[in-house]
Amino acid sequence: MSERESWHKEIDLFLVAMGYFTRIPMPKWVEVDSDKLNKASRYFGLVGLLVGLLSAIVFWLTQNWLPAGVSVLLAMLVGVLLTGGFHEDGLADTFDGFGGGWTAEDKLRIMKDSRLGSYGALALMLALLLKWQLLVELALYDPVVAGSALIVAHTVSRVVSASIIFSEKYVRDDETSKSKPLSQHQGINELLILIASGVLVLLFLKGLAALSLLLVMIGLRRLIIVIFRRQIGGYTGDTLGAAQQIAEIVCYFVLLVVGNIL
């Protein structure tokens, strides 16, 4: 394969990842199949970088003219519109299942139900409120830090979420599941590129902030995996969405705490 063909292949995989995780239209020439989607997992972090960057741009463009809370809300709205609330939906379904089911089978069945339950509604509401409040505090501390936090958190949280695919068992047997192709044949190349995208955005941060966030994310990933194993024996697409949302919120927490210390 020539260098040009290799670059074309990687761009193709990135566009597949973008089409999977966002509402941004893919070019007509991009063909999607299970093998491509599987390999595209290497670029899930970069998709987060794109979403975070666009959200940060909206925040930076409006923060001089609008109250911090409104600018943050607009930035969050951009993120939701770009992704279609994909991860938020997974968070709600996961909390409905984990909160309402007694056995792993019950939890998986509840998570499959498209209706929103009380546990999911509470989790979704609290998650959005937490993100808004934390970002407002970061914006009041330093608008540059708040915008950078959006970029870092959207990227790193997706790296944490997607990395679960490489070590854990996919527990749904439904062949029509949108996440089923991701559970097959993940390679070391996908993992290394995924991790590299997370390390890349840490350059936005100072040394202590970057190190603190890295250590917390490693610990959080381990904690999430332990919970998923105990609850359902592995992961589903919904739980990956929940992991992303939780990791994003924790990112904001860490950056706010470290920012106040510095």
UniProtKB/Swiss-Prot annotation:
Membrane spanning residue stretches: 43-63, 66-86, 120-140, 146-166, 191-211, 242-262
Secretion signal span: none
NCBIfam families xrefs: cobS, PRK00235.1-3
Pathway(s): Cofactor biosynthesis; adenosylcobalamin biosynthesis; adenosylcobalamin from cob(II)yrinate a,c-diamide: step 7/7
GO cellular component term of the entry, any: plasma membrane
EC annotation from Swiss-Prot or TrEMBL: 2.7.8.26
GO BP of this protein: cobalamin biosynthetic process
Gene: cobS
Role of this protein: Joins adenosylcobinamide-GDP and alpha-ribazole to generate adenosylcobalamin (Ado-cobalamin). Also synthesizes adenosylcobalamin 5'-phosphate from adenosylcobinamide-GDP and alpha-ribazole 5'-phosphate.
Membrane disposition: Multi-pass membrane protein
Record organism: Shewanella baltica (strain OS195)
Molecular function, one GO term: adenosylcobinamide-GDP ribazoletransferase activity
Keyword list, A-Z: Cell inner membrane, Cell membrane, Cobalamin biosynthesis, Magnesium, Membrane, Transferase, Transmembrane, Transmembrane helix
Cofactor: Mg(2+)
EC class of the enzyme, as a word: transferase
Localization: Cell inner membrane
UniProt similarity note: Belongs to the CobS family.
Name assigned to this protein: Adenosylcobinamide-GDP ribazoletransferase
Reactions that this protein is recorded to catalyse: alpha-ribazole + adenosylcob(III)inamide-GDP = adenosylcob(III)alamin + GMP + H(+); alpha-ribazole 5'-phosphate + adenosylcob(III)inamide-GDP = adenosylcob(III)alamin 5'-phosphate + GMP + H(+)
